[in-house]
């Protein structure tokens, strides 16, 4: 304090001066660690470092919105934080020793952000090996990421829910869409979808050659054309009887055939390819071991002008077939197989 005694004039006057001693060794500003919140919470307690001595610290909003309870308190409470990323800066003014600043961010996640949904399965046919995915949208700062679970694929942008994937291999390619939603209850959710790539060169359906069996045999092995996954083949019975061991195996066994004609269809489904659905049939003829041997019936005598008669050949069990033929003389059969 400076005091001036001016006698009877103006008397005694004084004035004070303050000298602030700043600490040159004081630590630079440290705003503390980043924080994550989830709605409905929009408040947080900050953790800046305390100024030393007469130095002064001040919080400011660099990005987003927020209200400080005390902008000069390193451990103040901040409220009204906006959804997304809010950046707060802690600045320490250390007088002639200098000013330092540090920033921290508060990420406010949305509790209403939907769980991960990878979208519907998709089918393409070579030469196409790409597709546009349809993952669920995310609300920042939540983040979604595509990854390959099975097969192959290259994502144009693995964080874009609607990214394009290329280089998918023939078969089933499984992709996962994983959404990270911070500290919310649904903090980490995932879902998968399949991209089926069908081969345009997959052969059309062939049920194999017809077969003939004789009882007591009532089973056989079918010979359908092979399929290239994800194409599928399916056997069905359309006449007769038969139990198919594995309806999707082109070379499955079939049992319980009945005497006569048993017909099976081999259907190949090749997705969106030009030969998407093709079919072929195979006939399995089961002959009766007990079918009678040929008997042309008794000899007959006719007198002109009658030159017609009814023959009496032995009966037969289908698929056995009888055939009349002329050995000597002449004759015309109304039905040579009757």
Language model features by range: what are they?
Residues 25-33, 112-120, 201-209, 290-298:
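Proline-enriched interdomain boundary motifs that mark the N-terminal boundary
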Residues 73-87, 160-174, 249-263, 338:
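Solvent-exposed segments in extracellular or luminal domains encompassing
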Residues 4-10, 93-97, 180-186, 269-275:
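Short, solvent-exposed loop/turn segments at the edges of extracellular beta-sandwich modules
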Residues 13-22, 101-109, 188-198, 278-287:
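C-terminal edge beta-strand
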Residues 41-52, 75, 128-139, 162, ...:
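A short beta-strand segment in extracellular, disulfide-stabilized domains
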Residues 58-73, 79, 143, 147-160, ...:
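Low-complexity "stalk/linker" and mucin-like segments enriched in Ser/Thr/Pro/Ala/Gly
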